[in-house]
């Protein structure tokens, strides 16, 4: 059985990697499909994201990497996959993902969505959070694969965030 795990993976986190590894244990083949979204300005190019994922998933023999720029369900049909694999971190994820699963099912009834609950240690983790921490010089080594942590550090040491700090004001003196 073929499963597609779609996402932007900008960048891949240990939470994503957890879902990928567990998916590879459940399905005969897992395709990690990196989305090309023209409406978003990603930190890393699609090629960089593919390379990041490839580097940290070399140990998974039944994994394939690909890109797509269509509806997820259309891509899944094209790849003749039977399953859309999704990770759930919190109840808020479930509400959105359930809506998407129903929509995808209405478009392609033979494709099932399988939800995997994220492992507890990654339940708070998102790519946006990782980028925010890295942007302000915090360590993300415990949140992303080692190769990604290095790339994030390189990215943000080249272009540190601009923070505008107002100049100090002179203390006011009381007038009589």
UniProtKB/Swiss-Prot annotation:
**Positions annotated to bind substrate:** 8, 40, 72, 86
What is the annotated localization of this protein? Cytoplasm
Keywords of this protein's UniProt record, alphabetized?
ATP-binding, Coenzyme A biosynthesis, Cytoplasm, Magnesium, Nucleotide-binding, Nucleotidyltransferase, Transferase
Which top-level group of life is the source organism from?
A: Bacteria
The biological pathway it contributes to is: Cofactor biosynthesis; coenzyme A biosynthesis; CoA from (R)-pantothenate: step 4/5
Mind telling me which residue stretches traverse the membrane in this protein? none
Q: Which residue positions does the secretion signal occupy?
A: none
The record's GO CC annotations read: cytoplasm
Q: Which SUPFAM superfamilies match?
A: Nucleotidylyl transferase
**What does the record give as EC number?**
2.7.7.3
Q: Which residues bind ATP?
A: 8-9, 16, 87-89, 97, 122-128
GO MF annotation, one: pantetheine-phosphate adenylyltransferase activity
Where primarily located? cytoplasm
Q: Which GO terms describe its biological process?
A: coenzyme A biosynthetic process
In this chain's numbering, which residues are marked as the site (Transition state stabilizer)? 16
**Catalytic class of the enzyme:** transferase
Reactions the enzyme catalyzes: (R)-4'-phosphopantetheine + ATP + H(+) = 3'-dephospho-CoA + diphosphate
- Summary of the function given for this chain in its UniProt record: Reversibly transfers an adenylyl group from ATP to 4'-phosphopantetheine, yielding dephospho-CoA (dPCoA) and pyrophosphate.
Its quaternary structure?
Answer: Homohexamer.
Family recorded in the similarity comment: Belongs to the bacterial CoaD family.
- The protein in question is named Phosphopantetheine adenylyltransferase
Q: What is the source species?
A: Acaryochloris marina (strain MBIC 11017)
